């Protein structure tokens, strides 16, 4: 069924391109063919995209990134249409999502967006993004299925980050910022450039006490790059980053009442996870050579390491069976270690009306998980005691991936260019679990292999020197995780089953768009518009629903299966102007309709999902609070046709910049997000909000002949102190009272008005 679906979607998209392609071929007989180049690369973004790119793409260079003085990545990406990111914990925790894909999931799942840093595909255990903002040279967002270039998890697109490098990093720099809730930031940077080399070293630290109870965070990062010209045509560059991070709870509270009366969470003090200690290490060695003015070679080798420990699953009952809400009472200590190593190589060549690129991508990944009981606990008041220190799980996943990919771009006339991409991934996954009490002392050794093909077909046509239209169809995929494949091997629960026959999740993206450069009332503006649809068929769901209890035979036991379907469609609009009459403007608008197309097996748990399942509780049982603390039932829902939660139907970001005098910039931003559903059954709402953000910046050259420059800035987010929720997530009866309502929704209240100011001294 999946293959038929994929073929039908691709055929429909390509038929839609056939008419303009045929027209262009006829025109080519009488018109000079256009010279084209391949600008896509899975290694390096040195090739600027041009008007022959058949997808939506937004790029921020270093000056744009630095001008915003952003505290987190979403403050930059808000101006990108289609970004539906999860933002939590004073903005320190971000999961980037695009066009509503994967917004229904909110735990440690992958986000459906490939994150690539200097050619290194980065996957972090929690699915969050830990990118050092102080080390960013460039950010690029590619929307639509992008597995044709980046492979696994590029269901909705990719975010490509390029870190600082090159001669532009020469000189000395010192930054110091202060802000609300104990926010502090410092940066030291030193760089040098000669005729054949450029190098820099940088230290950055950020910390804050946090608005929420137990929400402190800190990050200390060393980074650097050495770039050396081997000769006139080749270059070698070594980049590294070493980061030690800590963050505590995300700031969530349970229920709308707590969000209103206790937004800091002082009376709760517990989220599902807390006490994250994260050590990240990344290095990459890149080589490039221009063979001639029409062809070049690129290669990179890399390693990325992530060592993370954290607490999860707050205890509901202590070892004596008494209810507990102590902030130290968590049941699980998680120790996660991963190492991602790989190498990529690309060759590209231009033959006037034809351009080709081919590459190979080799990866060796190791993921190790160990979970132990942090404290002694019971899951029900009279259940068995799990002693502290009990080894709950100890497993390792090894992945070996080999991929070949390529792109062909060819002119069909003076104004029309077609693009074709193909990629094949071969992946071998091996899963080993030690014999521990948590899995009944069973030793597990198993595995699975996958072969996945990804494609893109695109067309661009220049209507004039200032405007063009484009269309494309592309695919994205995500491999099943080890948990989804082999979960039944790691538990003693007979109702939890493995499914080694799972297929990779697939997505088909179709997009039609237009770009135009035009003068509006004196302002030179670039305008963009796109119409898109992303279809997912047979995506992976638990047979009991996304986050339902695993202790029931409803749904045939708890097993991950290819049984879900979803569709995201919408319109994206953006506009940016150059400065004119001391003003410049930006606008980004998104109109999104994201729905489940197949999801008839959703179950909402009422009561304690770790207790005993009762299919049809009596009236007396339903009225007894003690019953719900030790038992539960489920309510079935058919979510087919319902909106995917946390996907607002409308988003708007408007920015204005005023330049009243040389060196001065005053900025304002209106950030609007419509309301959406907080749960899959579309019962509880996440209200919308409109926020105003303000900023001022002044840069001046200091007296004397040193060439030193001083930059001062101040920024106020949520200037009117509007109270709203950063995120809202509902799934089951969190209070164990037999009712699912707004008091069960996990909510992160917004901290309100936040201010920051700082200075930067540069030599």
Give the ranges of each region predicted by the language model.
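Transmembrane beta-barrel wall of Gram-negative outer-membrane proteins
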Residues: 178-207, 212-251, 273-296, 352, ...
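Membrane-embedded beta-barrel scaffold of Gram-negative outer-membrane proteins
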Residues: 188, 296-314, 462, 468-474, ...
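C-terminal beta-signal and adjacent terminal beta-strands/loops
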Residues: 477, 671, 675-677, 698-763
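Surface-exposed extracellular loop regions of Gram-negative outer-membrane beta-barrel proteins
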Residues: 253, 366-368, 373, 380, ...
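Short acidic/polar hinge/loop motifs at secondary-structure boundaries
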Residues: 113, 118-144
């Amino acid at each position: 069924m999946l293959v038929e679906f994929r073929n039908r979607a691709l055929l429909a998209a390509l038929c839609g391109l056939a008419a303009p392609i045929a027209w262009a071929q006829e025109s080519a007989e009488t018109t000079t063919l256009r010279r084209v180049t391949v600008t896509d690369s899975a290694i390096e973004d040195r090739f600027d995209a041009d008007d022959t790119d058949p997808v939506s793409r937004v790029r921020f260079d270093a000056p744009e990134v630095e001008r915003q003085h952003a505290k987190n990545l979403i403050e930059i990406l808000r101006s990108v249409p289609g970004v539906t990111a999860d933002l939590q914990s004073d903005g320190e925790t971000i999961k980037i999502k695009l066009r509503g894909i994967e917004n229904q999931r909110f735990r440690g799942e992958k986000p459906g967006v490939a994150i690539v840093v200097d050619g290194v595909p980065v996957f972090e255990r929690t699915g969050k993004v830990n990118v050092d903002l102080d080390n960013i040279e460039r950010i690029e967002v590619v929307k639509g299925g992008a597995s044709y270039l980046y492979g696994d998890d590029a269901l909705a697109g990719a975010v490509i980050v390029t870190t600082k490098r090159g001669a532009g990093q020469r000189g000395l720099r010192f930054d110091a910022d202060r802000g609300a809730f104990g926010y502090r930031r410092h940066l030291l940077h030193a760089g040098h450039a000669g005729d054949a080399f450029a190098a820099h070293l940088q230290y950055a630290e950020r910390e804050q006490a946090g608005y929420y109870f137990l929400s402190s965070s800190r990050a200390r990062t060393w980074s650097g790059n050495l770039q050396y010209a081997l000769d006139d045509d080749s270059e070698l560059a070594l980049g590294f980053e070493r980061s030690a991070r800590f963050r505590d709870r995300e700031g969530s509270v349970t229920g709308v009442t707590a969000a209103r009366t206790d937004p800091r969470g002082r009376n709760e003090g517990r989220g599902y996870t807390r006490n994250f200690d994260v050590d990240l290490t990344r290095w990459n060695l890149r080589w490039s050579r221009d063979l001639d003015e029409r062809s070049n070679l690129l290669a990179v080798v890399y390693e990325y390491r992530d060592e993370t420990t954290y607490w999860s699953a707050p205890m509901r009952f202590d070892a004596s069976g008494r209810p507990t809400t102590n902030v130290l009472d968590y049941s699980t200590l998680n120790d996660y270690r991963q190492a991602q190593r790989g190498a990529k190589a690309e060759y590209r060549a231009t033959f006037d009306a034809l351009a080709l690129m081919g590459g190979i991508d080799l990866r060796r990944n190791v993921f190790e998980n160990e979970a132990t009981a942090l404290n002694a606990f019971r899951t029900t008041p009279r259940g068995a005691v799990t002693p502290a220190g009990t080894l709950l799980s100890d497993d390792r996943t090894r992945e070996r991936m080999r991929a070949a990919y390529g792109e062909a771009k060819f002119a069909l006339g003076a104004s029309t260019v077609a693009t074709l991409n193909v990629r094949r991934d071969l992946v071998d996954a091996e899963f080993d679990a030690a014999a521990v009490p948590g899995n009944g002392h069973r030793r597990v050794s198993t595995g699975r292999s996958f072969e996945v093909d990804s494609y893109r077909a695109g067309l661009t046509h220049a209507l004039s020197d200032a405007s063009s239209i484009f269309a494309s169809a592309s695919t994205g995929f995500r491999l099943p995780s080890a948990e989804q494949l082999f979960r039944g091997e790691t538990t003693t629960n007979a109702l939890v089953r493995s499914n080694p026959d799972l297929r990779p999740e697939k997505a088909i993206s179709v997009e039609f768009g237009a770009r135009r450069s035009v003068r509006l009332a004196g302002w030179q503006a670039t305008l963009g518009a796109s119409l898109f649809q992303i279809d997912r068929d047979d995506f992976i769901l638990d047979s009991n629903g996304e986050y339902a209890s695993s202790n029931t035979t409803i749904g045939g036991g708890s097993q991950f299966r290819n049984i879900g379907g979803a569709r995201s469609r919408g319109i994206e609009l953006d506009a940016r102007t150059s400065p004119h009459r001391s003003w410049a403007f930006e606008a980004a608008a998104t109109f999104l309709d994201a729905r489940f197309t197949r999801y008839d097996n959703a179950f909402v748990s009422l009561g304690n999902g770790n207790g005993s399942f009762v299919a049809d509780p009596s009236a007396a049982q339903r009225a007894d609070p003690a019953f719900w603390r030790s038992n539960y039932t489920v309510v079935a829902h058919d979510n087919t046709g319902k909106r995917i939660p946390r996907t607002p139907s409308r988003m708007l970001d408007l920015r204005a910049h005023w330049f009243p005098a040389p060196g001065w910039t005053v900025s304002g931003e209106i950030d609007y997000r419509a309301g959406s559903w907080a749960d899959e059954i579309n019962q509880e709402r996440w209200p919308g909000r409109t926020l105003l953000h303000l900023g001022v910046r002044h840069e001046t050259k200091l007296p004397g002949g040193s060439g030193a420059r001083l930059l001062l800035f101040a920024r106020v987010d949520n200037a009117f102190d509007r109270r709203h929720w950063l995120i809202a997530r509902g799934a089951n009866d969190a209070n164990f009272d037999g009712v699912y309502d707004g008091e069960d929704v996990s909510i992160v209240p917004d901290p309100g008005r936040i201010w920051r100011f700082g200075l930067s001294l540069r030599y």
